[in-house]
């Protein structure tokens, strides 16, 4: 008698159920996340200076820094905001990219309140002049004068006109050169028009967005300008492209976008 091998009905049901479950898993993965193992925090990693010690304590200190961060050469880390700044003890963290959960001492030097003493100017040593030696004459050096920021009202966007700017940063000024909460002003020279001053944003916001600037850097973007003052006044940037990053700074009504993340402009304090 010929006997035929017949699959057990329970096995066939299990094979069909596993196939359906696998198909549903593929569909759900495609709908909700193309790569469930991807770490989306990599795009939020700020640029770092070469040679800095890794502040991580969760295993990332064993990784190559360039896997997540843009590594800036140490020689190029000059000017305001380069590297890490010393902070006063008790200062709230301005970061919004996850670094606010880290210990401040991992990257910054903590300075105790009232421990910074004012340094007095040392008196120059007397110089003996011999007969016939010409006396030194004072030399006048023309310094770049930063235009004063104009009070911006609710209708400032109606009297100002938008324009595009690009060029090399000649100098950096503003309260942001002394405090992380202050605004950064940059003077741009495009080689054609007279140099112009542009108010970017508070230093902490530029750090968080990855758009730190320094003299000699080429930047471009859009800004608002008072047509009655032309290049003699202070312009207000809507966006800036620096370090390969495009950062939005203000909306169409000249409102700073840092206000949406809880920041306070130093000029408004």
UniProtKB/Swiss-Prot annotation:
UniProt record similarity statement: Belongs to the magnetosome MamX family.
Miscellaneous comment text of the record: This bacteria makes up to 60 cubo-octahedral magnetosomes of about 45 nm in diameter which contain membrane-bound crystals of magnetite (Fe(3)O(4)).
PROSITE patterns for the chain: MULTIHEME_CYTC
Cofactor(s) demanded: heme
UniProt keywords, alphabetically: Biomineralization, Heme, Iron, Magnetosome, Membrane, Metal-binding, Transmembrane, Transmembrane helix
Domain free text: The C-terminus of the protein cannot be tagged, suggesting it is required for function.
GO MF term (any one): metal ion binding
Protein topology in the membrane: Single-pass membrane protein
Role noted for this protein: Required for correct biomineralization of the magnetosome, maybe via redox control. May function with MamY, MamZ amd Mms6 in biomineralization.
Subunit structure: Probably interacts with FtsZ-like and MamY proteins.
Motif MCR (magnetochrome) 1 in this chain: 48-71
Record's note on what induces expression: Expressed in exponential phase, peaks about 18 hours. Protein is associated with magnetosomes as they start to develop, maximal protein is detected early then decreases (at protein level). Second gene in the 4 gene mamXY operon.
Species whose genome carries this gene: Magnetospirillum gryphiswaldense (strain DSM 6361 / JCM 21280 / NBRC 15271 / MSR-1)
Protein name according to UniProt: Magnetosome protein MamX
Pfam families: MCR
Cofactor note as given: Binds 2 heme groups per subunit via the 2 magnetochrome (MCR) motifs.
Lumenal side: 32-269
Residues that, per the record, bind heme 2: 104, 107-108
UniProt-annotated location(s): Magnetosome membrane
Major place of residence: membrane
Binding-site residues, heme 1: 65, 68-69
An example Gene Ontology CC term for this record: magnetosome membrane
Effect of a null allele: Slightly reduced magnetic response, produces chains of wild-type magnetite crystals sandwiched between irregularly shaped, small flake-like crystals. Small crystals are in magnetosomes, but some have multiple nucleation sites. Phenotype is exacerbated when grown in NH(4)(+) instead of NO(3)(-) medium. Deletion of the periplasmic nitrate reductase operon also exacerbates the phenotype. Deletion mutants probably make some hematite crystals as well as wild-type magnetite crystals. Loss of magnetic response, considerable decrease in intracellular iron.
